[in-house]
Amino acid sequence: MSYKRPKYLRSMMLNVTDACNLRCRYCFLTQKPNYMSYQVAKDATDLLMECYNGKDEQSLNFFGGEPLLMWDSIIVPLTQYIKDNDLPIKLGITTNGILLDEEKAKFLKDNDIGLLFSIDGSKRFQDYNRPLPGGKSSYDVLEPKLDMIVEYFHPTFRSTLLPYACNSIWENYMFARDKGFKQYFTCPDDWSFYSDENLEDMKNEFSKIGLYYIDNYRKDSLPSDFIHFSPLEQTLKALHKFRTKYEKGDEDRHSSMQCGLGVYGCSINWEGAIFGCQECAGNGATEDNLHYIGDIYNGFDVERHKRLLSYYRDEEVTCCKDGECESCIYKYLCSTGHCHANSYLITGKSNNKAYARCVYDRSLLEVALSVDEILEGEVDSVYYKHFRRKK
């Protein structure tokens, strides 16, 4: 086999451990007592810097499992290494917050480490979806920390939407607002089964959020407690960016490579293997893992890297349910936000979307079109300033 050094990496996820202190019902990772050494973390960081283009900051994210378990062994010393050597790297961490305290929060903020915070809603949703080992309440641990988390980081309220909760999206959206969050994100768990009733509930809940947007975005300024629904705003931006394509019926479902899978972005597992995406790192550096593409010491395995790219560059994005694509209004935007790794893990094909994800995307576009139709002509509105079409 032959190898090549990566040239274009701009972001890297360090899967510093496969261990976790929660037992989430939908976790895609097989929890194992695997822990990255500091040496592997440092060597991965050096590889990322090999690809520095001399202009933009590189991005490095601590991921898991639960990365705060590696606070003393990796997060603190690697942050110090980056700081001591004045490396142009923007750090981030994805955490469930259970181990977060004031001292850690201050360290993260002082070192400009961004925080992605995973929480699924109020107590009944959080405790059902994301319990502690033994089924104990994780919400009771997190609730006293929420004010601190909002104050230090102003993070997105990032949740996973299970089927039973599809009729409660609005409830959790307002819960996040009342707790002081300014951004809310939710998406389906691609591994779960969603009934037609679940999906209809999801559409109805999105419509409620659409009305909330219309009521608030037609004003000349947003209220101080307004909470942005990130998926809808992403869809509105995509709608305006690709409106010409949409209105002309110019269909193109080939991937836009938005996530940088295996080219601009990659993931490193605990032993230094390189994967196209962090969601596939836990499956191990095995021959049958499509997303395993090399290691930090040798670089990309040329053939494996080429094979991965061919899977998502050469195939159109389609729905796993036959007959859905032809009449789908989202098909003109389908390449803009598709998750290849999830599709591969679930269907065995990189460009075959789970049906619930298709309904999710389509429902958001329907709401976006409704919001746009009502508000675009209101030239004094916040909406017109933020989302108006470019002529």
Locate the predicted segments by residue.
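Conserved C-terminal portion of the radical SAM core fold
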Residues: 55-61, 92, 140-240
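Conserved AdoMet/S-adenosylmethionine-binding subsite of the radical SAM
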Residues: 69-184
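Short, small/polar residue-rich loop motifs at catalytic or cofactor-binding pockets
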Residues: 258-263
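Conserved alpha-helical substructure of the radical SAM core
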Residues: 1-106, 110-111
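Short glycine-enriched, charge-decorated loop/helix-capping segments at active-site entrances
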Residues: 29-34, 128-136, 345
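Radical SAM enzyme core and accessory elements
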Residues: 1-2, 271, 285, 317-391
